[in-house]
Each structure stands twice: as C-alpha cells, then as structure tokens.
C-alpha cells in the first residue's frame, strides 16, 4: 500500500502538474495563530490593558469624593446585570444549568471577592503596587493549582517567562514592603497588601473553577452571576461596614462609569482567554496591567515611581514577550490529499 501514499507517488511526465499557488497564498492557507496564541493576545489587549486603568480610576474616585470600596463594587456589578437580556432572548437559564449551578455561583463569588479585595487595597496602597501583588499571587497560585489539580504542565520557555514576570513583580513591590511606615498607617498599608494577595488567590481559584464549567452560555452566565452575587453581598455590607457616599462632582461619576465599562470588557476577555490557554500564562500576560497602572500612577495621579518600578516593569514586559513569542505557533489547516 506504500505506492498509494502521496509521498511515494512519482510525478507523471505525461500529465502536466497544476500551477502552484503563490507563496503568500500557501502561507495563509497553511498557517494561522493557534488557540493559545489567540487567547493570550485577547488577554493582553482586552484583559490587561483595560484593567490597568481600573485601579488608578478607582483611586481617583476615592480621592475626589471618598467613595467607599463596596459602593464602587456595587456600581461595577450594575454593569453586569444587563447581560440578563441576551440570556433571556436566547432562552438560556440566568443561573446556568441546574446540575452545575452551584459551581457557577461559587465562581461568581470568587470573582466578587477578588474584585472587592482589589478595590479595598487600591485605597491604601499605590495602584501599581496593588496590581503587582494581586497579579503576582494569581500567577503563582494558578501555576500551582493547575499543575496539581489538572496535571497541565508548562514548557521551558513558558516557565522562563512566568518566573521572569514574577521576578519583575518582586522588584516592583519589594522596596515598598521593606519601608512600611510604623504606626496605624503602616498597619493599613500592610493590610492593603494582604488584601491584594487574597484578591489574587481568589482570582486564580475563580479561573480554575471557570475552566471546569462546560455549557454554551458559560461566559455570559458567570458574568451575570458575578453582578448578582456582588450586589447581594455588597449592598448590606455597605450599610453595615461603610458609609454610603453620593458623589456630587462629574469626575467621580466619570471614573465610576469608566471603571464599570473597562472592568466588564476585561472580565469578558479574560473569561475567553482562560479557555484557550494555560491559566498561569493568562495571568502572566495580564501583568501588562501593572505597567499601565504604573504609567497612570506617575502621569495622572502624580505619585512617585521608583527606579525599581521601572526596572521591574521592563522585566515584566520582556517576560510577556517571551511567553507570547513562544506561543506564536502555526497550525496546519490544510490536509494532505490521499
């Protein structure tokens, strides 16, 4: 049967061979970005970059009108509720299929806890440092949890980029941890870093639970549940733990609206990306949020950016480049005729 294999057929001189396609056409037909590459690019452009604006804008809203973190979380959750409309139009259950409804609600709860910790941390910790600790802890926890629970390993280049990004985050946040002020302010700052770490841990757990959900309307259902669970938990907590504030200036309302829109875009893109690529790599690419937050921290909030911040941001960008270049693979789309 070897003679019938296309690799063993000799060219027939009596029948002219068909004209070959142009090289550019053959390349387009033969190669396309892999699913992992598409996921990482979506996480970079749609997840990390918009999320980098969320922390500084939240801090601006707090500085302008002392907007509590739970009130900001409520405003963000309100942007998730309109997702119920397309779910109802398609006839999908708002809370997901009955057999996995519990896991979907648990995933939404983890997302809300992660967001709430992030908003609380950014009020007492510089926006860049809060994003650094949150993304660093989410990356490490995602790598460990995925390796232990899903037995999904990483290549050498992926580990190089992953460890490099974590090193960059340590360089950014390390000096700030060693120079904490004594007294009440130092305690609040330390608690802010702890909240940022817990936010990253909740984020990694939420991504892992989300990957275990398999039904057609998974992403919009979890997005709607995140808004619903966030409202049910934040509204009572706001009146018990904090004092509601009604912003009276245009800047605060603009920041709140921008935070809601950008956060929803980032949430959607990360939810798509984590189904295409390794969760740890998605979290590592999301470190671009730190770079954006540091830029806004310096130019918009006029807060100090140390040389170590610039050095760490450069290492983070280099690590993201390594991970992205490693996953810029091509998939063969055409099949060999037999």
Curated annotation (Swiss-Prot):
* Membrane disposition: Multi-pass membrane protein
Pfam family membership, one: EamA
Q: Which residues form the EamA domain?
A: 49-174, 272-325
Q: What is its main location?
A: membrane
Q: InterPro entries of this UniProt entry?
A: EamA_dom
Indicate where this protein resides in the cell: Membrane
Q: Per the record, what is one GO cellular component?
A: membrane
Q: What stretches pass through the bilayer? A: 37-57, 67-87, 105-125, 160-180, 190-210, 221-241, 250-270, 281-301, 305-325
| Keyword field | Membrane, Repeat, Transmembrane, Transmembrane helix
From the UniProt entry, list the residue stretches annotated as the region Disordered: 1-21
SUPFAM superfamilies in the record: Multidrug resistance efflux transporter EmrE
State the family named in the UniProt similarity comment for this chain.
Answer: Belongs to the SLC35G solute transporter family.
Q: Please, what other remarks does the record include?
A: The gene encoding this protein appears to have arisen by SVA-mediated retrotransposition of the SLC35G6 gene in the primate lineage.
Entries under PANTHER family matching the protein: ACYL-MALONYL CONDENSING ENZYME-RELATED, SOLUTE CARRIER FAMILY 35 MEMBER G5-RELATED
The identity of this protein, by name, is: Solute carrier family 35 member G5
Annotated source species: Pan troglodytes (Chimpanzee)
The root-end lineage is:
Eukaryota, Metazoa, Chordata, Craniata, Vertebrata
């Amino acid at each position: 049967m070897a003679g019938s294999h296309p690799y063993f057929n000799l060219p027939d001189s009596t029948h002219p061979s068909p004209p070959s396609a142009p090289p550019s056409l053959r390349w387009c037909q033969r190669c396309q970005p892999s699913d992992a590459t598409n996921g990482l690019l979506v996480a970079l452009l749609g997840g990390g970059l918009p999320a980098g604006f969320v922390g500084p804008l939240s801090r601006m809203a707090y500085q302008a009108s002392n907007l509590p973190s739970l009130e900001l979380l409520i405003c963000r959750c309100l942007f998730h509720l309109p997702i119920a409309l397309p779910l109802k139009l398609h006839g999908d259950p708002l809370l997901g299929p009955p057999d996995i409804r519990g896991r979907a609600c648990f995933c939404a709860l983890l997302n809300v806890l992660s967001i709430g910790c992030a908003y609380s941390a950014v009020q007492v910790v510089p926006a860049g440092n809060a994003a650094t600790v949150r993304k660093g802890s989410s990356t490490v926890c995602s790598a460990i949890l995925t390796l232990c629970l899903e037995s999904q390993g990483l290549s050498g280049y992926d580990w190089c980029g992953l460890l490099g990004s974590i090193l960059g985050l340590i360089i950014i946040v390390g000096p700030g941890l060693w120079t904490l002020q004594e007294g009440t302010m130092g305690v609040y700052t330390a608690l802010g870093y702890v909240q940022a770490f817990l936010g990253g841990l909740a984020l990694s757990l939420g991504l892992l639970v989300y990957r275990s959900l398999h039904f057609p309307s998974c992403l919009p259902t979890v997005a709607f549940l995140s808004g619903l669970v966030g409202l049910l938990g934040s509204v009572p907590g706001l009146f018990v733990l904090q004092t509601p504030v009604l912003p009276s200036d245009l800047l605060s309302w603009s920041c709140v609206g921008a935070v809601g829109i950008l956060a929803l875009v980032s949430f959607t893109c990360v939810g798509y990306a984590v189904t295409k690529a390794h969760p740890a790599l998605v979290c590592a690419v999301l470190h671009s949020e730190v770079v954006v937050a540091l830029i806004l921290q310096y130019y918009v909030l006029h807060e100090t950016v140390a040389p170590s911040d610039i050095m760490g941001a450069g290492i983070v960008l280099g690590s993201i480049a390594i991970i992205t270049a490693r996953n810029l693979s091509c998939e063969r789309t055409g099949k060999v005729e037999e």
